[in-house]
């Protein structure tokens, strides 16, 4: 069985843009990695059945690009929307009705919303750039707002964004007119919320904090997040610099995975109480440096991790579908400056 996927990359050093890879799920080996489309700063990708969207920039102009996906995984450019000079994004997602694309811009501390043509995949226009104006945290990296994630809530009623600079998670109402603040959830000073993964039941969320290296289990209801418990994602005695990165759930909703850049590891937790709790299982080395993103195959059999630094290795782990534990496979493929992983 062959599974195809994409890796998005920085293009500051050796990265080329969007890579296309093939994973042989019988052997656990990535058989090929090719440049799917050479494009600048494609650091995050979002997909629908027929289309792929990528963060990009040209000179000072920043925004997103739209592609048509072929069955082979090859990409054909539809158009680009580069209407902003306020900085390159770090996260994008598509609304469930495929009419909107949302973008988080870490450096400028803003959220963007674009209008899409769901039939052709075209990006029609940038609707809005929204600034955050909340009290800042006290960490040295919280000098201003830093929006790091934006996505639709499971009930499809709202859009939720994390703000690393203000220790807040903000939910918005959204429409053709743009985003409108609905509710704000505050976390601990110097947490630095980065990404969110929701349980499939829609009642619980796992919010990972880049600065404190904790994951919060939160009760989610009508745009509000209430923390129930929190867990450290690196060993307590690890004192070197490390920054938490990505968070993903296994498709069976039994295991949560979190990557740590610096400690260069993946923390594994069992999900308990129908989503309301976590039990630490293990912390395994990711196999290279700066594991900014990873993803899990639809079969739940493998976890594929990209690395932004070091030798740029794509590491493949075999999952124990009973315990969630990870066992590395012997894989030799690379994707320079890889920072996003998703499957077709």
From Swiss-Prot:
GO molecular function (one): 6-phosphogluconolactonase activity
Domain of life: Bacteria
Residue intervals passing through the bilayer: none
GO cellular component annotations of the record: cytosol
Cysteines joined through disulfide linkages: none
Xref: InterPro entries: Cycloisomerase_2, Haem_d1_sf, Lactonase_7-beta_prop, WD40/YVTN_repeat-like_dom_sf
One family name in Pfam for this protein: Lactonase
Protein family: Belongs to the cycloisomerase 2 family.
Protein name (database record): Uncharacterized protein SH1032
Taxonomic source organism: Staphylococcus haemolyticus (strain JCSC1435)
């Amino acid at each position: 069985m062959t599974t195809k996927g994409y890796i998005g990359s920085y293009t500051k050093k050796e990265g080329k843009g969007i890579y296309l890879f093939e994973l042989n799920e019988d052997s656990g080996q990535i058989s090929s990695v090719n440049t799917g489309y050479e494009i600048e700063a494609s650091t995050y990708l979002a997909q629908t059945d027929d289309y792929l969207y990528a963060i990009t920039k040209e000179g000072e102009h920043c925004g997103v690009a739209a592609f048509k996906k072929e069955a082979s995984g090859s990409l054909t450019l539809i158009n680009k929307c580069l209407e902003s000079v306020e900085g390159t994004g770090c996260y994008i997602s598509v609304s469930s009705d495929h009419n909107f694309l949302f973008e988080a811009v870490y450096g400028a501390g803003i959220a963007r919303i674009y209008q899409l043509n769901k039939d052709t995949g075209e990006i029609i226009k940038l609707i809005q750039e929204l600034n955050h104006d909340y009290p800042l945290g006290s960490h040295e990296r919280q000098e201003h707002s830093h929006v790091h994630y934006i996505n639709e809530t499971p009930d499809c009623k709202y859009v939720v964004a994390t703000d690393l600079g203000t220790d807040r998670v903000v939910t918005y109402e959204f429409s053709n007119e743009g985003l409108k603040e609905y509710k704000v959830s505050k976390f601990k000073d110097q947490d630095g919320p980065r990404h969110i993964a929701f349980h499939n039941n829609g009642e619980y969320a796992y919010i990972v904090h880049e600065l404190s290296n904790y994951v919060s289990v939160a009760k989610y209801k009508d745009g509000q997040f209430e923390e129930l418990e929190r867990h450290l994602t690196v060993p307590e005695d690890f004192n070197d610099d490390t920054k938490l990165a990505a968070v993903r759930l296994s498709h069976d909703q039994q295991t949560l995975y979190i990557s740590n850049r610096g400690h260069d590891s993946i923390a594994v937790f069992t999900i308990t109480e129908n989503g309301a709790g976590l039990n630490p299982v293990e912390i395994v080395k990711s196999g290279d440096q700066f594991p900014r993103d990873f993803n899990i195959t639809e079969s739940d059999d493998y976890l594929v991790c990209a690395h932004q630094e070091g030798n740029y290795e794509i590491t493949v782990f075999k999952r124990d579908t009973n315990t969630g534990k990870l066992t590395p496979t012997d894989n030799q493929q690379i994707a320079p400056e890889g920072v996003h992983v998703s499957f077709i």
